[in-house]
Amino acid sequence: MAKKVFKRLEKLFSKIQNDKAYGVEQGVEVVKSLASAKFDETVEVALRLGVDPRHADQMVRGAVVLPHGTGKKVRVAVFAKDIKQDEAKNAGADVVGGDDLAEEIKNGRIDFDMVIATPDMMAVVGKVGRILGPKGLMPNPKTGTVTMDIAKAVSNAKSGQVNFRVDKKGNVHAPIGKASFPEEKIKENMLELVKTINRLKPSSAKGKYIRNATLSLTMSPSVNLDAQELMDIK
Protein backbone atom coordinates (compact mmCIF):
# COMPACT_ATOMS: atom_id res chain seq x y z
CA MET A 1 0.00 0.00 0.00
CA ALA A 2 2.75 2.45 1.03
CA LYS A 3 4.69 1.61 -2.12
CA LYS A 4 1.64 2.34 -4.27
CA VAL A 5 1.11 5.72 -2.56
CA PHE A 6 4.79 6.59 -3.01
CA LYS A 7 4.62 5.78 -6.72
CA ARG A 8 1.50 7.90 -7.11
CA LEU A 9 3.14 10.87 -5.39
CA GLU A 10 6.34 10.41 -7.38
CA LYS A 11 4.33 10.57 -10.59
CA LEU A 12 2.55 13.74 -9.44
CA PHE A 13 5.76 15.47 -8.35
CA SER A 14 7.26 14.76 -11.78
CA LYS A 15 4.65 17.08 -13.30
CA ILE A 16 5.75 20.05 -11.18
CA GLN A 17 8.81 22.27 -11.53
CA ASN A 18 9.55 22.96 -7.87
CA ASP A 19 11.86 25.87 -8.60
CA LYS A 20 9.24 27.63 -10.72
CA ALA A 21 6.57 30.13 -9.66
CA TYR A 22 3.68 29.59 -12.05
CA GLY A 23 1.38 32.29 -13.34
CA VAL A 24 -2.29 31.89 -12.45
CA GLU A 25 -3.33 30.40 -15.78
CA GLN A 26 -0.52 27.86 -15.98
CA GLY A 27 -0.75 27.07 -12.27
CA VAL A 28 -4.42 26.13 -12.62
CA GLU A 29 -3.62 24.00 -15.67
CA VAL A 30 -0.89 22.11 -13.80
CA VAL A 31 -3.01 21.58 -10.68
CA LYS A 32 -5.89 20.13 -12.70
CA SER A 33 -3.45 17.67 -14.27
CA LEU A 34 -2.61 16.39 -10.76
CA ALA A 35 -6.13 15.07 -10.06
CA SER A 36 -5.73 11.37 -9.26
CA ALA A 37 -8.10 10.56 -6.39
CA LYS A 38 -11.28 8.53 -6.74
CA PHE A 39 -13.35 11.52 -5.62
CA ASP A 40 -13.73 15.10 -6.84
CA GLU A 41 -10.86 16.81 -5.04
CA THR A 42 -11.11 20.35 -3.67
CA VAL A 43 -8.87 23.03 -5.16
CA GLU A 44 -7.30 25.16 -2.42
CA VAL A 45 -5.27 28.37 -2.42
CA ALA A 46 -2.81 29.08 0.39
CA LEU A 47 -1.34 32.55 0.81
CA ARG A 48 1.42 33.62 3.19
CA LEU A 49 0.77 37.28 3.98
CA GLY A 50 3.23 39.89 5.21
CA VAL A 51 1.21 40.71 8.31
CA ASP A 52 1.59 40.13 12.04
CA PRO A 53 -1.78 38.82 13.30
CA ARG A 54 -0.68 39.47 16.89
CA HIS A 55 -1.55 43.10 16.17
CA ALA A 56 -5.29 43.74 15.86
CA ASP A 57 -4.76 46.24 13.05
CA GLN A 58 -3.06 43.56 10.94
CA MET A 59 -5.77 40.92 11.22
CA VAL A 60 -6.97 40.06 7.73
CA ARG A 61 -10.48 38.64 7.78
CA GLY A 62 -13.35 38.73 5.34
CA ALA A 63 -15.63 36.91 2.95
CA VAL A 64 -16.04 36.58 -0.78
CA VAL A 65 -18.81 35.11 -2.92
CA LEU A 66 -17.01 33.10 -5.59
CA PRO A 67 -18.54 33.61 -9.06
CA HIS A 68 -18.72 29.85 -9.64
CA GLY A 69 -19.15 28.64 -6.06
CA THR A 70 -17.03 26.02 -4.32
CA GLY A 71 -18.75 22.94 -5.69
CA LYS A 72 -19.89 22.04 -2.19
CA LYS A 73 -23.50 22.01 -1.01
CA VAL A 74 -23.57 24.33 2.01
CA ARG A 75 -25.92 23.83 4.95
CA VAL A 76 -26.81 27.09 6.68
CA ALA A 77 -28.04 27.67 10.24
CA VAL A 78 -29.68 30.97 11.17
CA PHE A 79 -30.26 32.53 14.58
CA ALA A 80 -33.23 34.88 14.27
CA LYS A 81 -36.71 35.53 15.61
CA ASP A 82 -40.17 36.51 14.39
CA ILE A 83 -40.31 37.72 10.78
CA LYS A 84 -36.56 37.21 10.31
CA GLN A 85 -37.05 33.48 10.87
CA ASP A 86 -39.55 33.47 8.01
CA GLU A 87 -37.08 35.36 5.79
CA ALA A 88 -34.39 32.80 6.58
CA LYS A 89 -36.64 29.85 5.74
CA ASN A 90 -37.86 31.45 2.52
CA ALA A 91 -34.25 32.11 1.49
CA GLY A 92 -33.39 28.43 1.89
CA ALA A 93 -31.78 28.20 5.34
CA ASP A 94 -31.51 24.60 6.52
CA VAL A 95 -31.78 25.24 10.27
CA VAL A 96 -33.54 28.22 11.86
CA GLY A 97 -34.07 29.00 15.54
CA GLY A 98 -33.16 30.96 18.64
CA ASP A 99 -32.71 29.65 22.17
CA ASP A 100 -33.96 26.27 20.97
CA LEU A 101 -31.18 26.10 18.36
CA ALA A 102 -28.58 27.06 20.96
CA GLU A 103 -29.78 24.18 23.16
CA GLU A 104 -29.55 21.75 20.24
CA ILE A 105 -25.97 22.88 19.58
CA LYS A 106 -25.11 22.39 23.27
CA ASN A 107 -26.45 18.86 22.91
CA GLY A 108 -24.14 18.14 20.00
CA ARG A 109 -26.00 19.26 16.88
CA ILE A 110 -23.49 20.61 14.36
CA ASP A 111 -24.97 19.57 11.02
CA PHE A 112 -24.31 22.84 9.19
CA ASP A 113 -21.38 24.59 7.50
CA MET A 114 -22.17 28.25 8.17
CA VAL A 115 -23.97 30.18 10.90
CA ILE A 116 -25.74 33.50 10.32
CA ALA A 117 -27.38 35.67 12.98
CA THR A 118 -29.25 38.93 13.35
CA PRO A 119 -27.47 41.40 15.69
CA ASP A 120 -30.17 41.07 18.36
CA MET A 121 -29.51 37.31 18.58
CA MET A 122 -25.78 37.52 19.29
CA ALA A 123 -26.34 37.22 23.04
CA VAL A 124 -27.95 33.84 22.36
CA VAL A 125 -25.19 32.85 19.93
CA GLY A 126 -22.65 33.81 22.59
CA LYS A 127 -23.94 31.01 24.81
CA VAL A 128 -22.55 28.49 22.32
CA GLY A 129 -19.53 30.56 21.29
CA ARG A 130 -17.11 28.08 22.84
CA ILE A 131 -18.55 25.39 20.60
CA LEU A 132 -18.89 27.39 17.38
CA GLY A 133 -15.66 29.42 17.69
CA PRO A 134 -13.11 26.58 17.45
CA LYS A 135 -15.00 25.20 14.45
CA GLY A 136 -14.83 28.53 12.62
CA LEU A 137 -18.61 28.86 12.73
CA MET A 138 -19.02 31.96 14.91
CA PRO A 139 -20.94 34.69 13.05
CA ASN A 140 -19.02 37.92 12.47
CA PRO A 141 -19.97 41.28 10.91
CA LYS A 142 -16.74 41.24 8.83
CA THR A 143 -17.93 38.17 6.96
CA GLY A 144 -21.49 39.42 6.58
CA THR A 145 -22.83 36.70 8.86
CA VAL A 146 -24.13 39.12 11.50
CA THR A 147 -26.75 41.11 9.62
CA MET A 148 -30.38 42.16 9.40
CA ASP A 149 -30.39 41.27 5.70
CA ILE A 150 -30.87 37.58 6.39
CA ALA A 151 -32.17 36.73 2.91
CA LYS A 152 -29.05 38.11 1.23
CA ALA A 153 -26.71 36.43 3.73
CA VAL A 154 -28.34 33.03 3.22
CA SER A 155 -28.30 33.51 -0.56
CA ASN A 156 -24.58 34.38 -0.47
CA ALA A 157 -23.80 31.34 1.67
CA LYS A 158 -25.70 29.04 -0.67
CA SER A 159 -24.06 30.64 -3.73
CA GLY A 160 -20.52 29.86 -2.61
CA GLN A 161 -19.44 32.42 -0.02
CA VAL A 162 -16.02 31.64 1.40
CA ASN A 163 -15.08 33.08 4.79
CA PHE A 164 -11.37 33.47 5.45
CA ARG A 165 -9.06 34.76 8.15
CA VAL A 166 -5.32 34.87 8.59
CA ASP A 167 -3.95 32.33 11.09
CA LYS A 168 -1.29 32.93 13.76
CA LYS A 169 1.49 32.47 11.21
CA GLY A 170 0.04 34.84 8.63
CA ASN A 171 -1.46 32.16 6.36
CA VAL A 172 -4.83 32.23 4.63
CA HIS A 173 -6.31 29.00 3.24
CA ALA A 174 -9.43 28.95 1.08
CA PRO A 175 -11.24 26.49 -1.22
CA ILE A 176 -11.88 27.82 -4.73
CA GLY A 177 -13.63 24.94 -6.45
CA LYS A 178 -13.33 21.30 -7.45
CA ALA A 179 -10.92 19.45 -9.72
CA SER A 180 -13.84 18.81 -12.09
CA PHE A 181 -14.34 22.56 -12.66
CA PRO A 182 -13.19 23.94 -16.03
CA GLU A 183 -9.87 25.79 -15.77
CA GLU A 184 -11.53 29.14 -16.50
CA LYS A 185 -13.92 28.80 -13.55
CA ILE A 186 -11.13 27.92 -11.12
CA LYS A 187 -9.11 30.87 -12.41
CA GLU A 188 -12.02 33.31 -12.05
CA ASN A 189 -12.75 32.08 -8.53
CA MET A 190 -9.12 32.53 -7.54
CA LEU A 191 -8.93 36.03 -9.02
CA GLU A 192 -12.04 37.07 -7.07
CA LEU A 193 -10.59 35.70 -3.82
CA VAL A 194 -7.18 37.33 -4.28
CA LYS A 195 -8.76 40.63 -5.34
CA THR A 196 -10.75 40.67 -2.10
CA ILE A 197 -7.70 39.83 0.04
CA ASN A 198 -5.67 42.55 -1.69
CA ARG A 199 -8.40 45.09 -0.90
CA LEU A 200 -8.14 44.14 2.78
CA LYS A 201 -4.41 44.86 3.04
CA PRO A 202 -3.86 46.61 6.40
CA SER A 203 -2.33 50.08 6.10
CA SER A 204 0.12 49.11 8.85
CA ALA A 205 1.44 46.08 6.94
CA LYS A 206 5.05 46.60 5.87
CA GLY A 207 6.93 45.18 2.89
CA LYS A 208 5.61 42.60 0.49
CA TYR A 209 1.96 41.79 1.19
CA ILE A 210 1.73 38.34 -0.46
CA ARG A 211 4.99 36.61 0.45
CA ASN A 212 4.20 33.17 -0.90
CA ALA A 213 1.31 31.47 -2.68
CA THR A 214 0.47 27.88 -3.57
CA LEU A 215 -2.33 26.01 -5.28
CA SER A 216 -3.16 22.38 -4.56
CA LEU A 217 -5.76 19.62 -4.61
CA THR A 218 -6.90 17.61 -1.60
CA MET A 219 -4.51 14.75 -2.43
CA SER A 220 -1.84 16.51 -4.49
CA PRO A 221 1.47 18.28 -3.92
CA SER A 222 1.40 22.10 -3.96
CA VAL A 223 2.19 24.22 -6.99
CA ASN A 224 4.03 27.49 -6.34
CA LEU A 225 2.36 30.60 -7.75
CA ASP A 226 3.86 33.94 -8.76
CA ALA A 227 3.18 36.07 -5.66
CA GLN A 228 3.91 39.32 -7.49
CA GLU A 229 1.31 38.53 -10.15
CA LEU A 230 -1.24 37.94 -7.40
CA MET A 231 -0.40 41.23 -5.68
CA ASP A 232 -1.04 43.04 -8.96
CA ILE A 233 -4.63 41.76 -9.13
CA LYS A 234 -6.99 44.66 -8.42
Curated annotation (Swiss-Prot):
Q: Does the keyword RNA-binding apply?
A: yes
Q: Which Pfam families match?
A: Ribosomal_L1
GO CC annotation: what is one?
A: cytosolic large ribosomal subunit
State the family it belongs to: Belongs to the universal ribosomal protein uL1 family.
Q: Which keywords does UniProt give here?
A: Repressor, Ribonucleoprotein, Ribosomal protein, RNA-binding, rRNA-binding, Translation regulation, tRNA-binding
Q: What is this protein called?
A: Large ribosomal subunit protein uL1
User: Which residue spans traverse the membrane?
Assistant: none
Q: Which GO terms describe its biological process?
A: regulation of translation; translation
Q: What does this protein do?
A: Binds directly to 23S rRNA. The L1 stalk is quite mobile in the ribosome, and is involved in E site tRNA release. Protein L1 is also a translational repressor protein, it controls the translation of the L11 operon by binding to its mRNA.
* Gene Ontology molecular function, alphabetical: rRNA binding; structural constituent of ribosome; tRNA binding
* PANTHER family named among the record's database cross-references: 54S RIBOSOMAL PROTEIN L1, MITOCHONDRIAL, LARGE RIBOSOMAL SUBUNIT PROTEIN UL1M
Q: Which InterPro entries match?
A: Ribosom_uL1_bac-type, Ribosomal_uL1, Ribosomal_uL1-like, Ribosomal_uL1/biogenesis, Ribosomal_uL1_3-a/b-sand, Ribosomal_uL1_CS
Q: Which organism is it from?
A: Helicobacter pylori (strain Shi470)
How is the subunit organization of this protein annotated in UniProt? Part of the 50S ribosomal subunit.
Q: Which HAMAP family match?
A: Ribosomal_uL1_B
Q: Which Gene3D superfamilies match?
A: 3.30.190.20, 3.40.50.790
